């Protein structure tokens, strides 16, 4: 399940492009998540009232949350699978406070892949997509394992 050095390099290469515009990428990823899976909006009191992509685009709170999400994910990706210290508090908050099911992490992973494909087609070919999918699956599996330890049936 682990990634090779080359795969991690591919992941971090495209992630550098994400970090160049965290707000733009984060906003686009969350809009994609919320429009493709409207049920995910119910987990966000701040965003429940946003019904259209235009309303979502106009929300500064949504933009800020996108930065928060991608900053945390970037920190995890840069650990190249050695992310225990980063995963533990994230799993704790998402299991006990936010009650985010693992399925929703799959949905946001799909949104990340989609947005990276559309924004960076030259840097996100099949190999890079495969590597990113593996990295996101590793992240989800480790979150799911922590959820289980916490007794959360997410």
From Swiss-Prot:
Positions of the Globin domain: 2-148
Binding-site positions, nitrite: 65
This protein's record includes keyword Cytoplasm: yes
EC number: 1.7.-.-, 1.11.1.-
Catalytic activity: Fe(III)-heme b-[protein] + nitric oxide + H2O = Fe(II)-heme b-[protein] + nitrite + 2 H(+); H2O2 + AH2 = A + 2 H2O
Pfam hit, one: Globin
Residues annotated for heme b binding in this entry: 94
MF terms (GO), sorted A to Z: heme binding; metal ion binding; nitrite reductase activity; oxygen binding; oxygen carrier activity; peroxidase activity
Binding-site residues, O2: 65
InterPro entries, A to Z: Globin, Globin-like_sf, Myoglobin
Gene3D superfamilies found in the cross-reference section: 6.10.140.2100, 6.10.140.2110
Membrane-crossing residue ranges in chain numbering: none
EC primary class: oxidoreductase
Location within or outside the cell: Cytoplasm, Sarcoplasm
Primary localisation category: cytoplasm
Residues with the Phosphothreonine modification: 68
Domain of life: Eukaryota
GO cellular-component term (any): sarcoplasm
Modified residues (Phosphoserine): 4
Record's protein name: Myoglobin
Organism: Perodicticus potto edwarsi (Potto)
The gene coding this protein: MB
